[in-house]
Amino acid sequence: MTTKDIIILCGPTASGKSYLGHELAKAYNGEIINIDSMQVYKKIPIITASPPQSYTAEVTYHLYNFLSITEDFSVVKYLKLAAEKIKEVTARVKLPILIGGTGLYINSLVFGYNNIPDISEDLREQVRNLHTEIGNIELWNKLEELDTLAASKINKNDTQRLIRAYEVFLETGKSICSFQTLPKEQILSDFNFKIIFLNPERKFLYKTCDERLDKIFKEGAIDEIALIKKQFAPKDYVDLKAVGIKEILAYLDGDMTLDRALNAAQIRTRQYAKRQVTWFKNQIQDKTTLEYSNQEEFAQILNVIPAEAGIH
């Protein structure tokens, strides 16, 4: 390894990334940098399975649980913060280990990103309020009137992309698609990325997904989301996509029993994990894939990663 090397430990939710990354950081003088879009937020460490205090007491962690849920966050903002932290870590002659499953962040960090102009806070607030008032379908119809191309590429149920495309057009007068076709900008072109993709066998992955959600529900996620619901208006947490939030809110509103909410969250987590695996397989080409089908094989992964990543 050199001071220009970065390890990215990626994979689906509940694949064991956090444990493996923590153990690597302890063994090889590393520091952990978050590359998960939901773990950046304050007040939801349980539902997002953020690193526990026992981990942060042993290893230095960056970009976890620092952002208010009312604040807007974008891939460009993430990249700037991540680049700063990576340079700080390497300046201390330590190994940056990025852990997460947000494909857009990983892809943009490694292969470059589309620099879309920032949206003013006033306009952002206006669009959020409009969405709260009229909902996805009507907002999609408004987007189609302004930007037919973008609307044709966005599912009406994809709230985040829908709002993003609408506000970009209002801010710039241009389709978000016009920015996405420009040459990509590289933020860390002089660094070497070593991407380790954890790919558990599907049956084992689904088992760990179910166990993860069961543990989260039992260890405080319901109280965590109840507090969010009490302290903030729904429009303030529209961008919180962590699996389990929607189901817990339904339980708190009396629309689901607790058992049904847990079951629904487990199903959605398995579906999300499956999509993540497909995305990483298809979108990240230059990577090392590590497969395992049970706990015993997973335990051996820690012995394999150093050689695959070139850690000495």
From Swiss-Prot:
The keyword Cell membrane does not apply. Its EC number is 2.5.1.75. Pfam families: IPPT. Its cofactor is Mg(2+). One of its GO terms (molecular function) is ATP binding. It catalyses: adenosine(37) in tRNA + dimethylallyl diphosphate = N(6)-dimethylallyladenosine(37) in tRNA + diphosphate. The record marks T102, R124 as: Interaction with substrate tRNA. ATP binds at G11, P12, T13, A14, S15, G16, K17, S18. It comes from the Bacteria. Keywords: ATP-binding, Magnesium, Nucleotide-binding, Transferase, tRNA processing. Residues 36-39, 160-164 are annotated as: Interaction with substrate tRNA. Substrate binds at T13, A14, S15, G16, K17, S18. GO terms for biological process: tRNA modification. The keyword tRNA processing applies. Monomer. Catalyzes the transfer of a dimethylallyl group onto the adenine at position 37 in tRNAs that read codons beginning with uridine, leading to the formation of N6-(dimethylallyl)adenosine (i(6)A). Belongs to the IPP transferase family. This is tRNA dimethylallyltransferase. It comes from Rickettsia akari (strain Hartford). The lineage of its organism: Bacteria, Pseudomonadati, Pseudomonadota, Alphaproteobacteria, Rickettsiales. The gene is miaA.
